[in-house]
C-alpha cells in the first residue's frame, strides 16, 4: 500500500521534472508560462527524485530505472547546477571582474547591522577587481568612494538616487544604456566599452525584473496558505513575463557589439530558465567553466539559487571564478578572472 502511494507520487514528480527540462526553450510570455515555475524549482525536483531513486534501490524495486532515466535526460541542466571538479587553466590573469547586487547599500535597514555601506566599500576596495559592476547602487547625495579612475554611472529608475554602476581600472571609451524598462522602471542594462591592453571588450551590466516578494510572501515558507501560494505564483508570473521581454532586448543589442562581450549582473532567474538560455547563447558561463559546488548567489530564504552571472565571449579565456559569501546584501558577490 505504502509503496503504491509512493510510486504514484514519484511518477507525478518525475513528470514535473521532465517538464522542467523544457523551461529554457519556452518563452514565459505565452500561455505555457507555468513551465517556467517548474524550471525555477528544478533543483528541488531533482533532489526529491534522487531521494526516490535511493529509496527504490534500498527496496530493490525496478522503479529505480525510471528515475535514473528521467534524471539523466536532464544531464545538461545538472552540469549548470553542480560543479564537482574545479577547472583552472592558468594561475595568471590579465584582468578580473566583479558583479555585485548591493541592495541599495542597506538603505532601508533590511540587515540589522550598522555601517553596511562602509563595509561593502571596504570589501570591494580590498578585492580590487579590474572591473566592478554594481546593481541596485544607491547614491542619494554623493557617490561612494571606490578606488577607480573610470566609471559609468547609469540611472536605474526615475529616482536619481537609484543607479547602476560600472567602475574600471582601464579606460572606458564608449558607454550607453539598453532600454529594457517595464511597468516599474528600476530595471536597466548599461554597457561600457573598455580598452584592456591592445584589445577592447564590451561589458554589459544588467539588473532584470525582480519577483517583488513582500514580507507576507516570505512568511508563506513558515505558514503555507492557499492565498500565500496564489500571491507568490502571480508575482512570479508577472516577473517571468517581464524578463522574457527584457532578455530579447538585451540579446538584440549584444548582437550589434563590435567587441567581445562580458555580460554580468542580477538576472533574477536560474540556469534552468528562458532568461539564462537566451542570454547565454553564444557565450560561456564563468561558474560552469571555472566554478565549484552549487554556486548559490542569492542570500535569502530561498536556498541554492544561482541568479547572478558573469557570461563571456569564447574569445576570452577564463582563469578562475569564485563566489564570496559576504553577508552584506541579499546577494553574494561573484568574481571572474580572465586572460
Task: Give residue spans per PLM region.
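Extracytoplasmic/periplasmic, Sec-exported soluble proteins
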Residues: 112, 116, 155-159, 184, ...
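Short, glycine/charged-enriched secondary-structure capping and boundary segments
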Residues: 112-114, 146-149, 218-219, 276-280, ...
Amino acid at each position: 500500500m505504502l509503496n503504491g502511494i509512493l510510486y504514484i507520487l514519484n511518477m507525478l514528480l518525475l513528470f514535473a521534472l521532465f517538464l522542467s527540462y523544457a523551461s529554457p526553450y519556452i518563452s514565459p510570455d505565452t500561455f505555457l508560462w507555468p513551465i517556467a515555475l517548474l524550471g525555477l524549482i528544478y533543483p528541488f525536483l531533482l533532489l526529491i527524485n534522487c531521494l526516490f531513486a535511493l529509496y527504490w534501490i534500498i527496496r530493490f524495486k525496478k522503479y529505480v530505472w525510471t528515475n535514473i532515466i528521467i534524471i539523466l535526460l536532464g544531464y545538461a541542466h545538472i552540469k549548470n547546477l553542480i560543479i564537482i571538479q574545479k577547472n583552472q587553466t592558468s594561475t595568471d590573469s590579465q584582468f578580473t571582474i566583479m558583479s555585485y547586487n548591493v541592495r541599495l547599500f542597506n538603505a532601508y535597514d533590511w540587515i540589522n547591522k550598522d555601517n553596511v555601506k562602509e563595509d561593502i566599500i571596504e570589501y570591494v576596495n580590498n578585492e580590487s577587481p579590474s572591473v566592478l559592476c554594481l546593481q541596485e547602487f544607491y547614491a542619494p547625495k554623493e557617490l561612494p568612494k571606490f578606488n577607480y579612475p573610470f566609471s559609468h554611472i547609469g540611472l536605474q529608475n526615475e529616482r536619481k538616487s537609484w543607479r547602476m554602476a560600472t567602475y574600471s581600472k582601464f579606460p572606458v571609451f564608449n558607454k550607453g544604456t539598453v532600454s529594457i524598462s517595464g511597468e516599474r522602471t528600476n530595471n536597466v542594462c548599461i554597457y561600457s566599452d573598455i580598452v584592456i591592453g591592445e584589445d577592447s571588450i564590451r561589458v554589459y551590466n544588467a539588473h532584470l525584473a525582480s519577483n517583488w516578494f513582500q514580507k507576507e510572501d516570505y512568511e508563506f515558507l513558515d505558514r503555507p496558505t492557499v492565498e500565500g501560494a496564489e500571491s507568490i505564483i502571480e508575482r512570479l508570473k508577472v516577473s517571468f513575463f517581464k524578463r522574457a521581454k527584457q532578455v530579447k532586448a538585451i540579446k538584440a543589442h549584444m548582437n550589434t557589439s563590435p567587441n567581445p562581450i562580458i555580460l554580468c549582473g542580477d538576472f533574477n532567474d536560474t540556469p534552468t530558465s528562458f532568461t539564462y538560455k537566451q542570454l547565454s547563447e553564444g557565450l560561456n558561463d564563468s561558474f560552469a567553466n571555472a566554478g565549484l559546488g552549487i554556486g548559490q548567489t542569492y542570500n535569502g530564504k530561498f536556498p541554492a539559487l544561482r541568479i547572478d552571472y558573469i557570461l563571456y565571449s569564447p574569445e576570452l579565456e577564463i582563469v578562475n571564478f569564485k563566489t564570496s559569501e559576504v553577508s552584506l546584501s541579499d546577494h553574494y558577490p561573484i568574481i571572474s578572472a580572465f586572460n
